[in-house]
């Protein structure tokens, strides 16, 4: 917890270049979402205040406060001394720090003029308040009407370079969320180059702070990393062309004493799928600056006269109740104001994916047999994975066929239509008339050199002039910056989905981007990809789309605009998945996680974990499925029971609030609780990863319940919410890998 001396500072800094001034009074309460008083601005949420003002002498925007609720007049800071090399701009908290005028910290924007200058002097011109939250051109964005959000746009202008910048601040008060983005427009006669652009820059007052991020690699995504913010620059990002497995575009700044359920935390999440940068700098004066936006190494964006570059959005969420509270605010906001799919909050079908069951080795007869066995298990959706396409270059391994999206005639002599019809005529076991649904795997952004498409259009693959085209997994990346490539993907996907009965698409992407012709290609690629997704998801709203980038490589808020679920990791080992899924939930709702029960020994780790444990871990994702050959399932008698349990918990997983009760990095007994929005139901997932010999299993205290209500636990004993939260529950486990799913219902 922050002590009282820190709390005074946190009330806000009101600083002018060269002198201090009395802070303006902006209303006596937070009754209005956005309040302006001349050139002072207040954004007010249920539990958050965001304040800044214009320096009347310089036109610069000065940060006053981002944190807990403040009202009325806020105190002025002590006037900073100006000594040494650091000028006044480097000694204050700035809203949109530019470069070249004495602030030696990381800038939010760096512009190179045609003459070579990189100095900017963006000054306040005007502002406007807009009801609701508007879309961004060509980019995914949060949305909301006048009841949900209010937007402040501050217009800046550089009189020397004729560059304009529009800073957008949208507040969703119910979620204590501020959403920021920037438009930079060249209003001059010559070309300019945007070398760096952050969607958000926050200068925190002097305090000791920690930073939290998600690091990893393929099959090892979303490991939580926490470290002390040191003097100097620290940070992370992606240069892979995508948000990537390596680092996720999520950052939290927290008080050192902050835990899951206590303390101040600020969460930042970029609504973007491309290369990004997240940087934190503690400057010489002790202020901490946090920036998220484009990766400057992969931008270099040319703007001709009249042209505009729009940054991705960054969502900033505040809570004084720990990281768990920040996560729940992200989850609610994204479910209601980012994810556009009709499936975002609706029950997901239990699925079986063919990949780990048969890999590339199948034909029409064997795939129909696999579907029949799936329906007999009680599965509702059968997904045919990689290996169904390619004529001259059949897809019988990963070294050929990508780009040739027609059924392999050797495997499907009559095409896919009769296969889909046969499978969707199967009745799901345990139902009277529910028919099995059919889904399919595609990897539209990729091409194998061994393909007809590549032989006809080698220029469509990303390449840098004469340099060799580096293959990964025997494939190259199509250049989605090209409209012709975008149209090709839209057209073949339309032909595949139109009138075929396919109701689910798994969209894969199994490598990073290499050999781009220019740094700006990365963002051009993303704009093309977003156009493709926007077109297809609008054209086929009844198709359930799943994003998959070799598992986890594009698990980001940008993708969630178009797809309601994402394959969380190619690692399906249940022990590893607990860590991956808990980490992913720092920013992203469990409803968006694809999680499957796979065969053992696990293909990635070689570990053997009990069937029930694997199932319980997978149930914590919004899309539960099986990734195995049904004929090899052990313990057939428990499969219908577990599938029924998965269907029972799914509505609470999709729309409930997640409480991470005990973290896998801290305990051998990780636990999570999901509480329905109305508080009437809850489901506890409790695991034992490794027992301690001759040691009691610890009690687990629940959270998020009504302390005055009574709850029935698994239809048996009844306890008060206060008892369950202050004392908790205790269970014993008979095996090394033990698990329990416990239902609670409010009386």
From Swiss-Prot:
Active-site residues, as the UniProt record annotates them: 508 (nucleophile), 570 (proton donor)
Keyword Nucleotide-binding attached: no
Enzyme class: hydrolase
EC number: 3.2.1.22
Molecular function terms from GO: alpha-galactosidase activity
Position of the signal peptide: 1-22
Named cofactor requirement(s): Mg(2+); NAD(+)
Reaction catalyzed: Hydrolysis of terminal, non-reducing alpha-D-galactose residues in alpha-D-galactosides, including galactose oligosaccharides, galactomannans and galactolipids
This protein's record includes keyword Flavoprotein: no
Protein purpose: Involved in galactomannan degradation.
The protein's name: Alpha-galactosidase C
Organism, as annotated: Aspergillus niger
Name of the coding gene: aglC
